[in-house]
């Protein structure tokens, strides 16, 4: 709920000033005059009360001490309890994810990985949010290399083979032979075909019709007839700059 707006304290109004003094009488008709002060009193002997035995005859269901278990504002606490219970139910609705490793990866686990797993356990929330990266030391890497390749005594190294040079490598190759000998390269160097042009939306204006108004361009026969007769001035058919 939004917080309540703070009410501004009203400015204290000045006290009213009366020209006449108030009368010594009841100020309102509903009020009664003050009773005279009691002067003659009686003294009654008092008896001490034992609070432990005074409620011994009361039934337990009417015990007043049970009210202390309930808070003063029950409605507000009930709402807060309902909100907390709803939050708890929504948070515990989805269980935490658990990761299972396959048997093949578990069988080929190295001592370094096992040592990192046996370390101080962290909460599941942190583990699920981070990627699982094994921490390997240099010693564990050596053990891993010895463990993964136990049957091979030596590493196979390919022989140093040099490709023979072509006899005409130093001589220049003519352009015709180069195109015939390398057809695959010519395919890569060829320019891509341009896409086909789409439909023409608006045709270009001919150069002789530049500066002429559109109305006379559409009526070229009438325009030519009126120009021959001299009934059209330049300001009537030319576009103003």
UniProtKB/Swiss-Prot annotation:
For the motif KEN box, what are the positions? 177-181
Record-level GO cellular component terms: chromosome; nucleus; site of double-strand break
Q: Name one Pfam family in it.
A: RHINO
Q: Signal sequence: where?
A: none
Biased composition, class Polar residues, residue ranges: 100-110, 181-193
What modifications follow translation? Phosphorylated by PLK1, promoting interaction with polymerase theta (POLQ).
Example GO biological process: recombinational repair
Q: Does the keyword Phosphoprotein apply?
A: yes
InterPro entries per UniProt:
RHNO1
The keyword rRNA-binding appears for this protein: no
Which residue ranges does the UniProt annotation give for the motif RAD1-binding motif? 56-62
Chain ranges for the short sequence motif D-box as given in the UniProt record: 129-136
Q: Cellular location of this protein?
A: Nucleus; Chromosome
Q: Identify the keywords attached in UniProt to this record, alphabetized.
A: Cell cycle, Chromosome, DNA damage, DNA repair, Nucleus, Phosphoprotein, Ubl conjugation
The Basic residues compositionally biased stretches are 1-10, 72-87
Region feature (Disordered):
1-27, 68-134, 157-204
State one molecular function term (GO).
chromatin-protein adaptor activity
Which purpose does this protein serve, as stated in its record? Involved in microhomology-mediated end-joining (MMEJ) DNA repair by promoting recruitment of polymerase theta (POLQ) to DNA damage sites during mitosis. MMEJ is an alternative non-homologous end-joining (NHEJ) machinery that takes place during mitosis to repair double-strand breaks in DNA that originate in S-phase. Accumulates in M-phase; following phosphorylation by PLK1, interacts with POLQ, enabling its recruitment to double-strand breaks for subsequent repair.
Q: How does it assemble?
A: Interacts (when phosphorylated by PLK1) with POLQ; promoting POLQ recruitment to DNA damage sites. Interacts with RAD1; interaction is direct and promotes association with the 9-1-1 (RAD9-RAD1-HUS1) complex. Interacts with RAD18. Interacts with TOPBP1. Interacts with UBE2N.
Q: What is known of its domains?
A: The RAD1-binding motif mediates interaction with RAD1.
Designated name of the protein = RAD9, HUS1, RAD1-interacting nuclear orphan protein 1
Q: Which organism is it from?
A: Bos taurus
What is the primary gene name for this protein? RHNO1
